[in-house]
Amino acid sequence: MMNASAMDRQAVYEDYERTRRTFHQLLDSASTADLARPTRGTKWTNGQLLWHMLFGYIVVRALLVLVRVFGRLPRGVGKAFARLLNAGTVPFDWVNYAGPLGAVKVFGPRRMAVAFDRVLDSLQRRLAAESDADLARGMHYPVRWDPFFKDFMTLADIYRYPTQHFDFHHRQLTLDSDDGRGGKPEVS
């Protein structure tokens, strides 16, 4: 288990604020055509990928509950649960892909920005209230579901996860390209 007292909460807060500024800047500067443009390395549009990036923070609230439950159970129970979830990777992948397709029809840029702020504020309040013992509690995760899931993750790891997810997908956006193929303009 990780040494929870080693978690730099301020660094997590700063990362959350950085992603908040970035998310708002991306939404504020994107035209309707920009949001409809394909992304780099995904089947989503920029708008759909932005929603998926927001969802990475939203899902953390559910993951926090899972850690609180499975972190108190024998490790074997958590391992079995992770194996069961890994077995369900195909339906998870389908839902994970299809969710943003419909979500952007309901959550336009303005609603995404509001939702992003709310979820970050909620996560920051929760993190402030966590004890070191809570942050050290952990569980096994389905490693096939996400490249940032490790076999065993603590609550502290879960608070860091959405920013890793955000930064990874941020590189796949084509909002700053001229050609829609991911080519970045030359900077002199």
Model segments located where?
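Extreme N-terminal tail/first-helix region
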Residues: 1-17
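Hydrophobic alpha-helical core bundles mediating ligand binding, dimerization, or RNAP-core interactions
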Residues: 16, 20-23, 116, 120-123, ...
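Acidic/His metal-coordination segments adjacent to aromatic residues that form catalytic metal sites
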Residues: 98-108, 147-156
